[in-house]
Amino acid sequence: MKTRLIKIVAASLTALLTVSCSSKKEIMKKSYWPNEAHLVISVSMQFETGGQPEGAESPFSGTPLPKGQPDLPAESWYRYGANEGIYRMLDLWKKYDIKVTSHVVGTAAAKYPEVAKAIAAGGHEIAGHGFAWDDQWNKNYADELKFVKDGVETVEKITGERAVGYNCNWLRRSPNTLKVLQELGFLYHIDDLSRDEPFITKVNGKNFVIMPYTLRNNDIVQVAGNHWSPDQFLSQLKHEFDQLYAEGAGKRRMMSISFHDRIGGTPAMVKAMEEFIIYAKQKQGVIFMRKDDIAKMVQNDPNTPIDNAEEKYNN
């Protein structure tokens, strides 16, 4: 009887220790973000107005004008981003003490330096978006390096901020892009859709951070492209948030949202985004972060996944 009692006590202690260790592991799993946050939200604010080429996509693209003929209504649609959109979004971020990442086209900053300076003055990240609104996928190594470098230096001269993050036009990288970015001292890029968390890839044997972008929570895709209303876009954000927040109890999750100056900066879209911010901030463990701050945090974190799916291009 005594022996049996000892065995029962021993088994109970073993079970208790197992539960305790399991609980500790669960706590560790929740410690992926500052203050054990469940979910990080990262907002992109693309500043492209003034950098677009002739015939760039607009609400008037369905009835294009002859080549060489200026499309004045389309040009005015783009100017809205510099005149109204960026400033309206900056007011929103300031109201809720949110810092975002702004991918800035070099020629946009050169044409509207006061807008680029206002973004930097608000404490927002200035990230690279090319010298002009142009393709990179078809450039050779030397031309691509010059294109990226010229864009970074143009914006840096205006804002005083040197980009460490990058976004290609329509995400379309060349096989050399990451090697170009690494040579120029970049920390991360966003032209990837493969995960809902940051990850590492090796470029010439060194860690390079991937901060996945979004098409689902992207105004140019859903509002301009699919003709969603601001209410539909808000509903999408809430559903995405709810799911990622629930998953964030057990693993690292990041929610990406993308706004473009002339689309996300309209009154109804800013109002919808404000409703989302209020909705998200009601939950505990939700933080908004700049992409460069996230990238610095995860770059050498052993919990960050390593994915070398594009290894053949990066070495």
Name every feature range the model reports, one short phrase each.
Residues 216, 222-233:
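C-terminal amphipathic alpha-helical segment
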Residues 260:
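Acidic/histidine-rich, metal-coordinating catalytic segments
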